[in-house]
Amino acid sequence: MKKIFLVLCLMVSLPLFGQYKVDTTITNEAYTAYVNKELGQALYVKYKLYKGGGKCQRATNWVNDTKLTLVNENQYKGTLYDKGHLANAEDFAYNCHLDSLTFRDYNRLPQTRKLNRGIWKVSENEIRKMSQTDSLMIYTGGHWGSPNTVVNGIKIPSVCWKVVYSLSLKKVVICTIFYNTDIPVKTETNLGSLELMLGYSLNVFVDNKKKKK
């Protein structure tokens, strides 16, 4: 009961109104990115993961292969924020082309170094391990509180989040919020509460109704 109360209190501290909405969708061979053009960033991405991992050498150059004006590489320079992957590069390391597609400007959000290299990375590794025995749909993105923190013209998400849907169990098995702070913490929640905070539906059950392992 205390944990539920804590989650609700944390969510109440994040505004529910005036949130950014998806206005552009970008799909490549690896994932789909749901972008807001005002932000110049993805609100979230979605991809299927089964037996993730491999030996491909990690790419290093980020690319904008669209005509959209997106947050660019130069804006990150001199900041204390990492370029945090949404669709994780290592998840696609079994195919070097797919791996390279994760280095797109619409597949990252600014994350504190301690988040990106800490509990976020741990979560990525745990999900990839799960994918060795189950086919998963991954939804991962950010949420911007008010007032926005803005660094070099980049609006910084207050939180990042992950939802994992098991295609074999036909249910959400992970729904986690990560606070994008210098001392990052995570909290487990449920899909309904997350969508209430975001102000839009992820259509998890609609998307996966006809999918099979």
Summary of predicted features, one role per range:
Residues 17-25:
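Cleaved targeting-peptide boundary
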Residues 66-213:
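Domain-level detector of nuclease and nuclease-like folds
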Residues 24-82:
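Short, His- and charge-rich active-site/binding loops that engage polyanionic ligands
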Residues 4-16:
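Sec-dependent N-terminal signal peptides
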